[in-house]
């Protein structure tokens, strides 16, 4: 379900990117931003002797774009003229806000910048569909579309503000009452709405992909940690139970493995005397012939014979016990 929603969002983002760029390109390339009445279409029909046209005379209908004005009525019907944003008969203060506004209006920098950003954003959307694992491309596309929308709305605001000082030859009484916005203007406004929507969708896709990537990484980490040998170690209680059982088994083993021969031998001769007798033979190996004493040798042999006789008696008794013990 999530992949289906993401695929639908990606499809809407792609279609919206194409629509926003197309609308803005059509808007800046056509001359139907404004319908107004102007005297430019019949102004050349007058001579210097006739004087200026009547003050109350209404101008002919024109439609204009960002760079041209075209006549719908009058002598020059169907002809278009380049808009002169700085007429020679007007004296402008170069530090005034009106002069700066006319410069921005003449350059149309914001609509052009918006179109360029929309193009770059559309390319990023296409690259994001090809390289789906790179989320930064989709994020870059979202940022570009948001910036394009902001540039577009700034250009529209500047265009609306400059209508009071429209560069056509409208008279003062005609400036407020005889103009309407055309479909090119509305295409530009619609492009702003679509661009912002596409930007939000692109950022949302980036956030969802990033969340899914983090969840997948966390799940793989937990899976790897559960399969490690440290995760299979027994618990403290299990280790304690095993240690208790092993201690019990070690305590019970001597009683089962004890032999009567060993008990007889250890009970007959203390361990201290046995070690003493054993160590007493070592000096005989290192002594010289001059230190040989017959008395010491006779005592040693007597104790050695007693030890052998006692060992034989203990072994004989143990063998009798084994024979007489019923199975």
From Swiss-Prot:
Membrane topology value: Multi-pass membrane protein
Keyword Transferase among UniProt keywords: no
Positions where Phosphoserine occurs in the chain: 259
Residue ranges, annotated region (Disordered): 235-263
Localization: Cell membrane
GO molecular function annotations of the record: calcium channel regulator activity; ionotropic glutamate receptor binding; voltage-gated calcium channel activity
Cytoplasmic side, ranges: 1-9, 129-136, 208-327
Domain of life, source organism: Eukaryota
Residues exposed to the Extracellular side: 31-107, 158-186
Bias kind Low complexity: ranges: 246-256
Keyword Membrane: yes
Membrane-spanning parts: 10-30, 108-128, 137-157, 187-207
Assigned keywords, A-Z: Calcium, Calcium channel, Calcium transport, Cell membrane, Glycoprotein, Ion channel, Ion transport, Membrane, Phosphoprotein, Transmembrane, Transmembrane helix, Transport, Voltage-gated channel
Known glycosylation sites: 42, 45
One Gene Ontology cellular component annotation held by this UniProt entry: AMPA glutamate receptor complex
BP-aspect Gene Ontology terms: regulation of AMPA receptor activity; response to cocaine; transmission of nerve impulse
Assembly and binders: Interacts with CACNA1C. Identified in a complex with the L-type calcium channel subunits CACNA1C, CACNA2D1 and either CACNB1 or CACNB2. Acts as an auxiliary subunit for AMPA-selective glutamate receptors (AMPARs). Interacts with GRIA1.
PANTHER family per the UniProt record, alphabetical: VOLTAGE-DEPENDENT CALCIUM CHANNEL GAMMA SUBUNIT (PTHR12107), VOLTAGE-DEPENDENT CALCIUM CHANNEL GAMMA-4 SUBUNIT (PTHR12107:SF7)
Family: Belongs to the PMP-22/EMP/MP20 family. CACNG subfamily.
Known role: Regulates the activity of L-type calcium channels that contain CACNA1C as pore-forming subunit. Regulates the trafficking and gating properties of AMPA-selective glutamate receptors (AMPARs), including GRIA1 and GRIA4. Promotes their targeting to the cell membrane and synapses and modulates their gating properties by slowing their rates of activation, deactivation and desensitization and by mediating their resensitization.
Entry protein name: Voltage-dependent calcium channel gamma-4 subunit
Native source organism of the sequence: Mus musculus (Mouse)
Taxonomic placement: Eukaryota, Metazoa, Chordata, Craniata, Vertebrata
